[in-house]
Protein backbone atom coordinates (compact mmCIF):
# COMPACT_ATOMS: atom_id res chain seq x y z
CA UNK A 1 0.00 0.00 0.00
CA UNK A 2 1.54 3.33 -1.02
CA UNK A 3 1.88 6.39 1.18
CA UNK A 4 -0.64 8.13 -1.06
CA UNK A 5 -3.35 5.51 -0.54
CA UNK A 6 -2.65 5.36 3.19
CA UNK A 7 -2.89 9.11 3.64
CA UNK A 8 -5.83 9.51 1.26
CA UNK A 9 -8.08 7.27 3.34
CA UNK A 10 -10.95 8.69 5.34
CA UNK A 11 -10.16 10.47 8.61
CA UNK A 12 -9.27 8.17 11.48
CA UNK A 13 -10.11 8.77 15.13
CA UNK A 14 -7.07 9.42 17.34
CA UNK A 15 -7.94 6.36 19.44
CA UNK A 16 -7.68 4.21 16.31
CA UNK A 17 -4.20 5.61 15.65
CA UNK A 18 -2.99 5.37 19.25
CA UNK A 19 -4.68 2.16 20.38
CA UNK A 20 -5.82 0.39 17.21
CA UNK A 21 -4.30 -2.64 15.51
CA UNK A 22 -4.16 -1.26 11.96
CA UNK A 23 -0.89 0.23 10.67
CA UNK A 24 -1.66 3.81 9.58
CA UNK A 25 1.69 5.59 9.29
CA UNK A 26 1.55 9.36 9.42
CA UNK A 27 3.84 10.42 6.57
CA UNK A 28 5.15 14.00 6.49
CA UNK A 29 4.47 16.51 3.70
CA UNK A 30 7.17 14.80 1.61
CA UNK A 31 5.61 11.36 2.05
CA UNK A 32 8.25 10.20 4.54
CA UNK A 33 8.31 8.78 8.03
CA UNK A 34 11.36 8.85 10.35
CA UNK A 35 12.94 5.48 11.15
CA UNK A 36 15.31 4.65 14.01
CA UNK A 37 17.33 1.47 13.52
CA UNK A 38 18.87 -0.20 16.56
CA UNK A 39 21.07 -3.25 16.96
CA UNK A 40 18.75 -5.99 18.23
CA UNK A 41 21.59 -7.62 20.17
CA UNK A 42 23.14 -4.59 21.91
CA UNK A 43 20.37 -1.97 21.76
CA UNK A 44 22.80 0.54 20.20
CA UNK A 45 21.23 3.16 17.96
CA UNK A 46 22.70 2.46 14.53
CA UNK A 47 21.11 5.13 12.36
CA UNK A 48 18.17 7.43 11.71
CA UNK A 49 16.74 7.44 8.21
CA UNK A 50 13.48 7.84 6.31
CA UNK A 51 11.00 5.54 4.63
CA UNK A 52 8.33 6.33 2.11
CA UNK A 53 5.35 4.01 1.66
CA UNK A 54 7.18 1.75 -0.78
CA UNK A 55 10.23 1.40 1.49
CA UNK A 56 7.98 0.56 4.44
CA UNK A 57 6.10 -2.03 2.39
CA UNK A 58 9.30 -3.63 1.08
CA UNK A 59 10.76 -3.76 4.58
CA UNK A 60 7.65 -5.48 5.91
CA UNK A 61 7.48 -7.90 2.96
CA UNK A 62 11.19 -8.82 2.71
CA UNK A 63 12.35 -8.61 6.33
CA UNK A 64 15.29 -6.46 5.21
CA UNK A 65 15.56 -2.69 5.72
CA UNK A 66 14.69 -0.41 2.79
CA UNK A 67 14.89 3.37 3.03
CA UNK A 68 14.24 6.45 0.96
CA UNK A 69 17.25 8.68 0.27
CA UNK A 70 16.30 12.34 0.36
CA UNK A 71 19.57 13.39 -1.29
CA UNK A 72 19.43 10.82 -4.10
CA UNK A 73 15.63 10.95 -4.26
CA UNK A 74 15.31 7.20 -4.59
CA UNK A 75 14.58 4.01 -2.73
CA UNK A 76 17.58 2.02 -1.50
CA UNK A 77 18.12 -1.26 0.26
CA UNK A 78 20.47 -0.93 3.20
CA UNK A 79 23.67 -2.71 2.24
CA UNK A 80 23.00 -2.77 -1.51
CA UNK A 81 26.53 -1.44 -2.15
CA UNK A 82 28.45 -2.41 0.99
CA UNK A 83 26.83 -5.78 1.58
CA UNK A 84 26.04 -4.74 5.15
CA UNK A 85 22.34 -5.60 5.06
CA UNK A 86 19.98 -5.00 7.97
CA UNK A 87 17.80 -8.02 8.74
CA UNK A 88 14.73 -6.73 10.52
CA UNK A 89 13.88 -8.77 13.62
CA UNK A 90 11.18 -6.45 14.98
CA UNK A 91 9.33 -3.34 13.84
CA UNK A 92 7.45 -0.92 16.07
CA UNK A 93 5.55 2.29 15.47
CA UNK A 94 5.25 5.11 18.01
CA UNK A 95 1.98 6.24 19.62
CA UNK A 96 0.86 8.55 16.80
CA UNK A 97 2.45 6.45 14.05
CA UNK A 98 4.77 9.18 12.76
CA UNK A 99 7.98 7.31 13.60
CA UNK A 100 9.12 3.71 13.13
CA UNK A 101 11.65 1.78 15.21
CA UNK A 102 13.31 -1.28 13.72
CA UNK A 103 15.47 -3.72 15.64
CA UNK A 104 17.95 -5.26 13.23
CA UNK A 105 20.68 -7.82 12.86
CA UNK A 106 23.36 -5.67 11.20
CA UNK A 107 25.32 -7.99 8.91
CA UNK A 108 28.97 -7.10 8.54
CA UNK A 109 28.89 -5.03 11.71
CA UNK A 110 28.68 -1.57 10.07
CA UNK A 111 25.55 0.52 9.63
CA UNK A 112 27.26 3.83 8.85
CA UNK A 113 28.52 4.82 5.41
CA UNK A 114 31.76 5.87 7.15
CA UNK A 115 32.42 2.19 7.91
CA UNK A 116 31.57 2.42 11.61
CA UNK A 117 29.14 0.29 13.57
CA UNK A 118 26.82 3.25 14.24
CA UNK A 119 26.26 6.65 12.66
CA UNK A 120 26.39 8.04 16.22
CA UNK A 121 30.16 7.79 16.71
CA UNK A 122 30.72 11.29 18.17
CA UNK A 123 29.67 12.66 21.53
CA UNK A 124 28.93 16.37 22.02
CA UNK A 125 30.95 17.83 24.89
CA UNK A 126 31.81 21.36 25.95
CA UNK A 127 35.28 22.70 25.34
CA UNK A 128 37.22 24.85 27.80
CA UNK A 129 35.49 27.96 26.48
CA UNK A 130 32.05 26.32 26.78
CA UNK A 131 31.64 25.90 23.03
CA UNK A 132 30.44 22.52 21.81
CA UNK A 133 33.11 20.10 20.57
CA UNK A 134 32.73 16.65 19.05
CA UNK A 135 34.58 13.77 20.71
CA UNK A 136 34.99 10.56 18.72
CA UNK A 137 33.70 7.55 20.66
CA UNK A 138 34.18 4.87 17.97
CA UNK A 139 37.20 5.06 15.70
CA UNK A 140 37.03 1.44 14.53
CA UNK A 141 35.97 1.08 10.93
CA UNK A 142 34.52 -2.23 9.78
CA UNK A 143 35.30 -1.31 6.17
CA UNK A 144 37.10 1.36 4.14
CA UNK A 145 34.38 3.57 2.60
CA UNK A 146 36.72 4.71 -0.20
CA UNK A 147 37.11 1.11 -1.36
CA UNK A 148 33.45 0.21 -0.95
CA UNK A 149 31.90 3.34 -2.46
CA UNK A 150 34.77 4.33 -4.75
CA UNK A 151 35.12 7.86 -3.38
Swiss-Prot record:
Gene name per UniProt: hisI
InterPro entries: PRA-CH (IPR026660), PRib_AMP_CycHydrolase_dom (IPR002496), PRib_AMP_CycHydrolase_sf (IPR038019)
GO MF annotation: an example: magnesium ion binding
Family: Belongs to the PRA-CH family.
Protein name: Phosphoribosyl-AMP cyclohydrolase
One annotated Gene Ontology cellular component of this protein: cytoplasm
Entry EC no(s): 3.5.4.19
Residues bound to Mg(2+): 94, 96, 98
Alphabetical list of NCBIfam families matching this protein: PRK00051.1
Gene3D superfamilies registered for this protein in UniProt: Phosphoribosyl-AMP cyclohydrolase
Amino acid sequence: MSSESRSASSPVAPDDIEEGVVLRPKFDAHGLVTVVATDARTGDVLMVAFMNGEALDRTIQTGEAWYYSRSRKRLWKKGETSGHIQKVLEMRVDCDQDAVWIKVDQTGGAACHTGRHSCFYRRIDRGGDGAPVLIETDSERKFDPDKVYGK
